[in-house]
Design a protein with these regions (language model features):
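Histidine-acidic metal/acid-base catalytic patches
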Residues: 1-24, 58-60, 98, 153-272
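Short secondary-structure transition/capping segments
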Residues: 34-38, 77-79, 114-117, 157-159, ...
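Short, well-structured secondary-structure segments
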Residues: 21-27, 63-68, 100-104
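A short acidic, glycine-rich active-site loop
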Residues: 38-51, 121-123, 221-231
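Active-site acidic/histidine proton-transfer and metal-coordination neighborhood
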Residues: 9-11, 16, 51-59, 73-172, ...
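Flexible loop residues that form catalytic
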Residues: 28, 72, 107, 206, ...
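Short glycine-centered, acidic/aromatic-flanked micro-motifs in structured strand/loop junctions
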Residues: 69-71, 146-148, 177, 252-254
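Glycine-rich, proline-tolerant flexible connector loops at the mouths of alpha/beta enzymes
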Residues: 24-52, 106-117
Length: 272
């Protein structure tokens, strides 16, 4: 999402005008969305004809690189919570239109149940809710990528435990530099430990005022500053990814035209 209160086609027009050729399907839900029908939100429906969505991107010369399916994996399953069912729909959509990656994460628990889980209970809950999506992804040739965006996945130790416990070829990692740093992690160390699992990157830098929140806040949707101007070691992370042999797509999760374009230039200056 680039601008609030703007439909998906208008968002794509904007990034096309900036010269971008790749993008994610980010905000989505199953069923219908009033905001999308009446023209003030960029939500895509997981129940839509997936080829209509692909055509919307392709008509602007843009290739879909992933479908985001960020979920609530720690609270109890319920019809109103984005979880296993929606991830499965995202996997089916991706497979239908030739998109390799579906990106998900556990999110912040909102209920007393989710907030009271021990680390081991949380790891088990995530495993249980991703079991069927991973089976389907494996059968359909799609990979589910876990993103640091919660108190479990922001820990490289816990992320490694999850990856090992699934033992699935359909599971990989989407590195989010801003989320990981904000949750208390070190993106450079993360790449050194799990670089061979990383298949997509969300780039975000964070301003100094977030230092006091580090380790207590898990995930932020969009950065508001250009890459290379904040406190995250973007250059070191880029170099670590190069050493790890990373050759996948990356996404600028950054708000504002000036910040987006400066970030693109910064990555190019590093050799992207």
């Amino acid at each position: 999402m680039i601008n609030p209160f703007q439909t998906l086609d208008k968002q794509l027009d904007q990034i096309q005008s900036w010269g971008f050729e790749f993008a994610d399907v980010t905000d989505n839900t199953d069923g219908a969305c009033l905001g999308a029908e009446f023209g003030f939100t960029a939500v895509a429906s997981l129940d839509a004809n997936p080829f209509d969505i692909r055509r919307m991107f392709e008509s602007r010369g843009i290739t879909i690189t992933s479908i985001c399916a960020h979920a609530n994996l720690l609270d109890p399953a319920a019809p109103w919570r984005y979880g296993t069912s929606q991830i499965i729909k995202a996997v089916r959509m991706a497979a239908a239109i030739g998109v390799k990656h579906v990106i998900t994460t556990e999110g912040d628990p909102q209920t007393g149940f989710g907030q009271s889980l021990s680390t081991e209970e949380a790891l088990f809950t995530i495993r249980e809710k991703l079991y069927e999506p991973l089976r389907l992804a494996g059968d359909l040739g799609v990979k589910i990528l876990l993103e640091p965006h919660g108190h479990i996945t922001d820990s490289v130790d816990n992320m490694e435990k999850l990856l090992n416990s699934f033992n699935s070829d359909a599971l990989g990692v989407n590195l989010d530099t801003g989320n990981l740093w904000l949750g208390g992690g070190d993106p450079v160390e993360f790449v050194k430990r799990l670089g061979n699992k990383i298949e997509h990157v969300h780039w975000k830098d964070m301003p100094e005022e977030f230092i006091s929140k580090r380790g207590t806040m898990f995930g932020c949707g969009m950065a508001t500053i250009p890459l290379g101007t904040g406190v995250v070691d973007i250059k070191g992370t880029f170099e670590a990814l190069q050493k790890a042999g990373f050759a996948g797509h990356t996404t600028l999760e950054i708000a504002g035209e000036e910040a987006v374009l400066k970030s693109r230039d910064y990555l190019k200056s590093l050799g992207a």
